[in-house]
Amino acid sequence: MQHLIQGTALALALALSAPARAQGTPVANEQFVPVPSYRVGPYAAAGTSVFGGFIDYMNFINVRDGGINGVKLTWEECETSYTVDKGLPCYEKLKGHPPTGASMFSFYSTAIVYAVLDRAGTDKVPLVTIVHGRTDASDGRVFPYVFPLMTNYWSQNTDIVKFIGMRSGGMDKLKGQKIVHLYLDVAYGKEPNEIFLKQAAMYGFEPKLVPVPPPGTDQQSQWLEIRQFAPDWVIVTGYGVMNPAMLKAAARANYPRDHVIGNFWTGSEEDTIPAGDAAVNYISSLINPAGTDFKIIQDIQKVLYDKGLGNMTDKSRIGSVLYNRGIMTGIITVEAIRTAQGKYGKKPLTGEQTRWGLENLNLDDKRIAQLGATGLIQPLKVTCADHEGGGAVKFQQWDGKKWKIISDWIQPDRKLVRDMVQASAAKYAAEKGITPRDCSKGG
């Protein structure tokens, strides 16, 4: 009896001293996906939605399908607060996570992407920078491990200028107009400036760059400058708390909100609802729409939320623009891993192997329909040379309660964007001593 008591006590002590298997801790036949989220700070409202949707999709695949061809997805969150100081340690902490290292990183922070870009290539860990990150990384010949998928900042800016041209009665009507680019003064906000100025020269409109110091809650001086300039249009590249502050400032300046065009990080419910009436008639681009009518969103609600398994504590945000963007991120992550399994086998894969899956990803209308995501995402075809794979956006307008889509897919100026991407990537390659891949030889 004494031996039994001692044995039980020893077993209990060992159990208590052993670390509990937390969500994301890998075991055999598991695929690890890092989640470098930001749930605190001035960008938390966006981060909780995007990463909540991302986690929900991975959990959905595990619960409904048992993983990807039998390989369970695991993950671990690491709080970046949308800062490089925290983002870099998160990268270093998670990149070598067992059993096979990080599948890919989706930081949703341009500054962090810039900070880890070189080391990710060395470490052979893909960076999936859906609608963010370094634009010239769209040239996969120079940046084999970076994927600015769906659309990049330069493509989107040409979409916005094209939309303004359509609203003005034709691209020739842009000549003589005044257009402001109001942007958060960080790497992300500055990214469109080069092509914005290029398009000003092409179409003859007068440009003005107006930076907003982060986090962007005080814009009094910026809107005084805008009023003095008297622009026909204001393009906004904002994020987080800057966006509702921008809409309120525009209202105080009596500037018509239907002539304020935000980018796809300036067009969510988290931006418009806090601004109240000041947001009515405001327009933004979108890469994915809001809504819960999509089959995939309805399936997630049934499989996860009806059973208390969802990640979002505020269920009213399910189906928001940014939540759905997280679902889109999950779809791309899972389908890239699935594609890579087709080549390397149904087993846990390395970052180098998932990179191949990303570069050979082909989401056509048929596959999107099978995923229940028709209307949620646009077709995506990635190649060795083209790591963007899409480029089109739609536009939406806030009616005071919800977003209404007001355009079809608008295609970017692909020649202009590609010429600039290749020139910038070539300069980077020369500076770093990189020999671009020959895609005719299979990358």
Predicted regions and their residues:
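Beta-alpha junction/loop-to-helix N-cap segments that form part of ligand/metal-binding clefts
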Residues: 24, 30-32, 45-52, 63-140, ...
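Extracellular/periplasmic Venus flytrap/periplasmic-binding protein
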Residues: 86, 135-136, 144-254, 291-298
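Short, low-complexity disordered leader/linker segments with a strong preference
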Residues: 1-32, 427-443
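Segments of small-molecule ligand-sensing domains
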Residues: 309-323, 334-408
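Venus flytrap/periplasmic-binding-protein-like
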Residues: 80, 127-129, 135-138, 215, ...
